[in-house]
Amino acid sequence: TYAPALDNGTINGASVIDDYPMLLNGEVWPRNANWRYQGLTALHTAIAQSLNTCAVRTNLAYGVSNSYDFLVDKLGFENLTYTDSQQVGNMALGGFEKGVTTEEMSAAYAAFVNEGVYTKPRTFIRVEDANGNVVLENEAQSTVAMKNTTAAIINHLLQEAALNGTGYEAQFSGMHIAGKTGSTNSNKDRYFVGYTPYYSCAVWAGYEHNQRIVASGNPCSAVFRKVMSAIHADLADKDFFSCSGLTSVAVCADSGMLASENCALDVRGSRVYTALVAADNAPTAVCTMHTAPTYTVNMADSDGNVTTVTGSVLNYQRELIEGHDEIVVEDAFMMLGGWNGFFGDEADDDFNMPDGDHDTTVAGPPDTTDQPSNVDDFIRAG
């Protein structure tokens, strides 16, 4: 989902995707593994935390059938069907009609290591007779699957997923690794596909009779770690490839745009981070999502001193699925019109603090004239 969308510019390395579900046949879909929704989410977080909603929204933005074509034509997946090409759940979440093989997955991920070049798997290179004469040659078949900048960004993102995300159990000392976990409903199938600068490896675990895998962690990550650590025992650590055409930019984690001063003043803490992006698809506009209301805070000391502090909130109002308001989205509390009643809906509203022990009054509302429009398939590419 993410690699082809990066490759054609649908998203960039700083994009923000809405971790919020949709309605499918009247039901809330998709669910995340942790049954939580964070709202506006930076791409690197969406991948590291395996957020299904973000994968679905990205796939819809890129095109379900386009995703199918990319996997079949560029990355050598041979078992995908026409039904897969028409279903976003299949293409975004891996719910394929016939499934894929670990060989296909390992070969596809190897393209990220090889600067975007896909090489068809082969079990032998050549056959020689007793005299060393070559009687059968099995030449490599390679094609350019994606830009080298796309592969480099994916490497960067999947390193974070393996280091701080769901793939942390696959780590072993002395080697750079990148990778991604996977699972099916009720953990009846588990996956880990990862790679180093030397090798790629895909691991699947499951029972013959489709039973739930009960484990404290992901058994595939543990297998990957044991196998790959042995293979790399005598290999020197090295980083993944670098290439021209990349740039690092300071961006807002809530808008995907270039960071402003207000992004660092978010009431949750600074929302500024550095993203790796392709130079020809980098964000150019400064964040319009953050606005900074000024609070006069009564310190309630004996001399009646008053201190003025500044914070910022998201200049955006979340649309909720009608009839499903019980779905709590974490970022809604940081937006204008947040559910906790902290912020007014209109520019002329008085701001009121939530009930409780406090000495704070709000001096004035933020400007809401530039509030972005709300769309169900919210993806910001900067």
Q: PLM ranges: what are they?
A:
Residues 17-22, 34-79, 85-114, 159-160:
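Active-site-adjacent helix/loop patches that line small-molecule binding or acyl-intermediate pockets
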Residues 1-40, 75, 119-133:
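Short, glycine/proline-biased beta-turn/loop segments that scaffold the active-site neighborhood
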